[in-house]
């Protein structure tokens, strides 16, 4: 992920008040977001998930204070409503992830990461993900309606298709989405669930038609391997960092702060029980713990989530 995009995401979260709490990065790779965590967020506890074992092990070595699960996101045992924010550059592609909890939605991989992560953050928490423009621009509104019922779109930034050229050698139009989780599901269908047509006849998400200042380039139609498709061409001689900074300044939200349990910096973890599978929950003396490698850390969960986790532990332990 280009540093200029990581900086912009952290700039947005900083102005939303994120200074501490739990921060999640699914598909963390070797930990570029972790490495660029600003000083103002050093009190955050950072959690990562990475499928690739080499990248995941590198991230663990580089960022030993972070908690990194080297496994697929679909297999990571991460509690619901636990994180204050989530960041990342999620995988794009026309592939689907097998995850029993979400299979009924038939999501492509980038939409799966958005939908699942909404369950992992607290009400009021914010997701800041780079995703394929397909999430916002696909004809079917189903994914956007699902997200809108569970989160408020703080804003979206359409990136020029050269944003990843230097780092990945690809010309791809992508978006940064900023979503703030609702405290309950609402039957709502805001404008951004649907598409519209701009003044040049290009069909795209209605949010970008109504907010052209959040499109950091010129939208145009171009021939691709899949036929004609819309692309965001970069402005000539424009500095992407400046454009991003200006766009981010227009994002307005406040991430609520939750009281941290226990004295600051106190390590309440205990040595791992070898009979407890790595990256899974267990109960010790009536208290919930989550095993990460050689330690088990206490976790505080909302009551309904805690009851579900305890039920799963009981079911697991009796089989």
Region spans (language model):
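Class I S-adenosyl-L-methionine
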Residues: 1-62
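Conserved Class I SAM-dependent methyltransferase catalytic core
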Residues: 51-53, 106-165, 172-179
